[in-house]
């Protein structure tokens, strides 16, 4: 099994979600199944089937989270430094077409959320940035087309 790089914050979020699913969602779903069973005929019991589907989805996510946690390689970004972009870096970019500034942190796949400025290490943006430094220009090919960015800042913050 391949290790999955992840920040301390990302690992904590996975553990919190797993705990919630095991200690809150699982008992809630079991209760919903019991209540639906008490209604009688299970063949046409929509509440029962909905609760069983919720149970299946929850247990699937629990297994996925347990796998991610067991394969996690936790990286303390606050202990990293350097002038080149690598995992954990927070990178400030200028879009060379629009002059718009963007900031992304390069994180592990399980914690990526583009809307929050966290891009996966395997994303086109991160792959283009890895190994580059301030002042470098990178070309990024995305589903929306090609973009050109200048790197104007690199920092490592936990």
Curated annotation (Swiss-Prot):
Alphabetized InterPro entries for the sequence: GreA/GreB_C_sf, TF_GreA/GreB_CS, Tscrpt_elong_fac_GreA, Tscrpt_elong_fac_GreA/B, Tscrpt_elong_fac_GreA/B_C, Tscrpt_elong_fac_GreA/B_fam, Tscrpt_elong_fac_GreA/B_N, Tscrpt_elong_fac_GreA/B_N_sf
Keywords assigned by UniProt, alphabetized: DNA-binding, Transcription, Transcription regulation
Keyword Ion transport: no
GO biological process, one term: regulation of DNA-templated transcription elongation
Disulfide bonds: none
PROSITE patterns assigned to the protein according to its UniProt record, in alphabetical order: GREAB_1 (PS00829), GREAB_2 (PS00830)
Domain of life: Bacteria
Molecular function in Gene Ontology: DNA binding; RNA polymerase binding
HAMAP family the UniProt entry points to: GreA_GreB
Family statement: Belongs to the GreA/GreB family.
Chain's role: Necessary for efficient RNA polymerase transcription elongation past template-encoded arresting sites. The arresting sites in DNA have the property of trapping a certain fraction of elongating RNA polymerases that pass through, resulting in locked ternary complexes. Cleavage of the nascent transcript by cleavage factors such as GreA or GreB allows the resumption of elongation from the new 3'terminus. GreA releases sequences of 2 to 3 nucleotides.
Protein's recorded name: Transcription elongation factor GreA
Native species: Methylobacterium sp. (strain 4-46)
Organism phylogeny: Bacteria, Pseudomonadati, Pseudomonadota, Alphaproteobacteria, Hyphomicrobiales
Recorded name of the encoding gene: greA
């Amino acid at each position: 099994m391949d290790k999955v790089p992840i920040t301390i914050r990302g690992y904590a979020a996975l553990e919190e979600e797993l705990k919630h699913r095991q200690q809150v969602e699982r008992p809630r779903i079991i209760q919903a199944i019991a209540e639906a069973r008490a209604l009688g005929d299970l063949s046409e019991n929509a509440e029962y089937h909905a609760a069983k589907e919720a149970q299946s989805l929850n247990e699937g996510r629990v297994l996925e989270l347990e796998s991610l946690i067991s394969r996690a390689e936790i990286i303390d970004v606050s202990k990293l430094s350097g002038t080149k972009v690598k995992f954990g870096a927070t990178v400030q970019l200028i879009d060379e077409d629009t002059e718009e500034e963007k900031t992304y942190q390069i994180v592990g796949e399980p914690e990526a959320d583009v809307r929050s400025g966290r891009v996966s290490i395997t994303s086109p943006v991160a792959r283009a940035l890895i190994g580059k430094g301030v002042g470098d220009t990178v070309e990024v090919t995305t589903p929306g087309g090609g973009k050109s960015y200048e790197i104007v800042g690199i920092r490592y913050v936990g």
